[in-house]
Design a protein with these regions (language model features):
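Alpha-to-beta junction loops
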Residues: 44-45, 82-85, 103-111, 154-155, ...
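Short helix-initiation/N-cap motifs at beta->coil->alpha
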Residues: 31-33, 87-99, 142, 159-162, ...
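Periplasmic-binding protein-like
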Residues: 130-138, 205-246, 265-288
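Ligand-binding clefts/hinges and TM-proximal coupling segments of bilobed small-molecule sensing domains
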Residues: 31, 166-177, 217, 247-292
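Short loop->beta-strand "edge-of-pocket" segments that line small-molecule binding or catalytic clefts
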Residues: 43-48, 66, 148-161
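A ligand-binding cleft/hinge motif common to bilobed small-molecule-binding domains
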Residues: 96, 112-121, 166-169, 183, ...
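Extracytoplasmic small-molecule ligand-binding "clamshell" domains
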Residues: 29-108
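Acidic, polar ligand-binding/catalytic clefts
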Residues: 74, 86-149
Length: 292
């Protein structure tokens, strides 16, 4: 009996010590992703998409990821570390980009992410760096011309995206199918499993450009999507560095060059109204819009 009591006491003390040490030493320090920590490390880890042309796509011939978001990521590396080459590009998807930045596995993501009130509860965002709008991609032979034509029809989007949430609200009778990546949605569209793919117009436009004989962008824009760069909650130094990068890109004219390089057109006339808009204001505008 005495030995049993001693064993219980020892186990209790060990557990208590473990809990105290665990509380005192978190698994990953909150400042591991600060600007100072990044400078000491010598590289910045930025998440980008590999399946969202022209914002981020992997070239199978060169095995290099390129795109609008990639150029923004390199500009951030240049601002923070003095060289655009001091960036480690990490593949992210719509459903894992937030957890990756929350856990400190990446320092930030530039990945076609809409600034929303819900997301701002879990991570911080930079100011707005691009504004898109939700649309539809269909086969050219399709009878679908608007989201209003989707009742009883199949529509695909990616998991964890705002377009998925929006289309469910707008067309509750649609058969919404989700995958992790856009290419999976395109396969479903071409194979007849779904009648449309929905996400931001610039992403859909990239896929339309790859197959203009068979695919068509329809429905116009029925939302606006203010894109921000996702950063770990409370990482004020990196938020400032990223916002300073955006301001520099506008002032130098480099942003306009990036826009023309990847989107094949000049910045829009309302560019000054939304570019570098504070994240809080962008989230409020997103929440107050009436899709349709």
């Amino acid at each position: 009996m005495i030995l049993a009591r001693r064993a219980v006491l020892a186990a209790t003390l060990t557990l208590a010590a473990t809990l105290v040490l665990g509380a005192a030493v978190p698994s990953r320090a909150a400042d591991d992703n600060s600007v100072d920590a990044i400078k000491k490390r010598g590289t910045i880890k930025i998440g980008v998409k590999y399946d969202a042309p022209p914002f981020g796509s992997l070239n199978p011939q060169t095995n290099q990821v390129t795109g609008f978001d990639v150029d923004i990521a390199r500009a951030i590396a240049k601002k923070v570390l003095g060289s655009p080459d001091k960036v480690e590009l990490v593949q992210v998807k719509s459903d894992n980009r937030v957890p990756l930045v929350q856990n400190g596995d990446i320092d930030a993501f530039v990945a076609t992410a809409t600034i929303t009130p819900a997301r701002m509860k879990t991570i911080d965002f930079s100011n707005v760096y691009y504004r898109a709008g939700q649309s539809l991609l269909v086969k050219k032979s399709s009878s679908v011309k608007s989201y209003k034509d989707l009742d009883g029809k199949g529509v695909c989007s990616v998991q964890g995206s705002t377009p998925e949430q929006t289309i469910r609200k707008l067309v509750p009778k649609a058969n919404v199918v989700t995958f992790e990546t856009y290419p999976e949605c395109l396969t479903a569209l071409r194979g007849g499993r779904v009648d449309a793919v929905t996400t931001d117009n610039v992403i859909l436009g990239g896929y339309e450009a790859q197959d203009p004989a068979n695919l068509e962008l329809v429905g116009g824009l029925f939302t606006f999507e203010p894109y921000g760069i996702g950063i770990r909650k409370g990482n004020a130094s990196l938020v400032k560095a990223v916002n300073d990068t955006l301001a520099d890109l506008k002032k130098s004219g480099e942003y306009a060059k990036i826009h023309e390089r990847w989107l094949k057109k000049s910045v829009p006339g309302d560019f000054g109204q939304w570019f570098n808009m504070p994240a809080e204001k962008a989230a409020e505008q997103f929440a107050n819009q009436k899709p349709g």
